Structures are given as C-alpha cells and as structure tokens.
C-alpha cells in the first residue's frame, strides 16, 4: 500500500474508535474516482440502517464522480435515514479530506435533515 493510503486508513481507524466509544450512529462515506457511497451504520456497527450511492438506479444515469452527484447521494441518504428513524449521526469521512465531494455530501445530508 502507498503511504498516502496507509495514512488515510490510520486516520479513519482513529476516528472510528472515537465514534465507537461514543456509541454513535455513523454516516460512513467512501469515495472512489468514479463513485461515492454513503451508509448509515448502527452504533454497534452490526447493521446498515440506510445507504445510497451513485450506483443506485436513480443516480446512475447522470455523472457519478462529481460534486453534483455527491449532493444527490447526500440528499438520498438523509431521506432514507429519516425513513429508518435516524436523525442524529456522527460523520465518518473514512480519512478523506473534508473537501469537495465529501463536503458536498455532508452539506446535502444536513440540508436533508440529518444532524451531525
């Protein structure tokens, strides 16, 4: 693995440990070069309560690797999380910088009604 990836994974592990101590439901984000994925995971980490990604049929047709697609994923995951009864989450950025697509997804999820 590259040093950049190892560093990102170390940051993610530290953040997840803190979220586990707080027993918080978390909104976990992963981004690849072409897609972005978001999951709302239960406090004990055993169950996915809601999820959305640019691979969903509703979002697959348009561009999938840009800020606009991330905003749509954020709105969709917020809508699905509220339907599952979740309104308060901890934002798990998986070690990625809070910038660009990750920030756009987080802002859209907040606008959709999730509290971080």
Curated annotation (Swiss-Prot):
Keyword set includes rRNA-binding: yes
Protein known as: Large ribosomal subunit protein uL18
Gene: rplR
Pfam families given in the database record: Ribosomal_L18p
Annotated GO CC locations: cytosolic large ribosomal subunit
Keywords of this entry: Ribonucleoprotein, Ribosomal protein, RNA-binding, rRNA-binding
Function description: This is one of the proteins that bind and probably mediate the attachment of the 5S RNA into the large ribosomal subunit, where it forms part of the central protuberance.
Species for this entry: Ectopseudomonas mendocina (strain ymp) (Pseudomonas mendocina)
Quaternary structure note: Part of the 50S ribosomal subunit; part of the 5S rRNA/L5/L18/L25 subcomplex. Contacts the 5S and 23S rRNAs.
GO MF annotation list: 5S rRNA binding; structural constituent of ribosome
């Amino acid at each position: 693995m590259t040093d950049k990836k190892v560093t990102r994974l170390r940051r993610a592990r530290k953040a997840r440990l803190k979220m586990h101590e707080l027993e918080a439901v978390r909104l976990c984000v992963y981004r690849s070069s072409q897609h972005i994925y978001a999951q709302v995971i239960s406090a004990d980490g055993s169950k996915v309560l809601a999820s959305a990604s640019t691979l969903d049929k509703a979002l697959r047709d348009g561009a999938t690797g840009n800020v606009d697609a991330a905003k749509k994923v954020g709105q969709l995951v917020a809508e699905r999380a509220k339907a599952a009864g979740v309104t308060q989450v901890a934002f798990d950025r998986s070690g990625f910088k809070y910038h660009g697509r990750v920030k756009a997804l987080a802002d859209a999820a907040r606008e959709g009604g999730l509290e971080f």
